[in-house]
UniProtKB/Swiss-Prot annotation:
Disulfide bonds: none annotated. The keyword Cytoplasm applies. This is Protein-L-isoaspartate O-methyltransferase 2. The gene is pcm2. InterPro entries: PCMT, SAM-dependent_MTases_sf. Coiled coil: none annotated. Keywords: Cytoplasm, Methyltransferase, S-adenosyl-L-methionine, Transferase. The active site is at 97.
Amino acid sequence: MSRKSTGAFLVILLLSMAAGGAVGAADDPYGAARAKMVREIEEDARRTSERIGKTALDPRVMEIMARVPRHEFVPAAERAYAYENRPLPIGYGQTISQPYIVAVMTDLLKVGSESTVLEVGTGSGYQAAILAEFVRSVYSIEIIEALAETAAERLKRLGYDNVRVRTGDGYHGWKEHAPFDGIVVTAAAGHIPPPLLDQLKPGGRMIIPVGGPFFVQQLMLVEKDEQGRTRTRQILPVAFVPLTGGH
């Protein structure tokens, strides 16, 4: 898709969202806030275009970011801030990621309707919901049992039947359902976990923040070619909660 056609799509998307907010505010009180969030994501994409390698994210990603109800994935006390372009606390020392980062990570995976994706770090379930709009199946692992249970119930209530959540140490992946077309890790690891590399399908992509909690973390893109060789590329400096577990 050309840059011109991408821009036209986004203009239409934002205008339709604004109209929906004006006409159906009673039905969707968050419509205007979601439209503002989408604009801010686009602004961040332009600002970081040299790092992410593009001036605009996939229009499919933006359409889904505009549609998935982020307010359903944050605690009641944080709902007034649900569509601000920043992370929010969800309890147990964890956060729901900044919408811009969620959009970039989803875009970089380059997954499709037949893809199977592994998510390490379910958290609130928001990233899993975004992915579920694109792919056939999402397998999500959360080490904190209470978060895993709440996220699973929430995703089921919202109709995301193609997401499966379990409690466990995501460092080791989910071997029973490997290999995966894409892997997204939503907590920072000190290194790229070898089990996740093993479970990435040839031709697949993994997006993972790497670095310690007291050092600069880098969002890394890992690509595995058809011969099983991997290459990595730094995308952005980021700040994620640490990946926990027995590794």
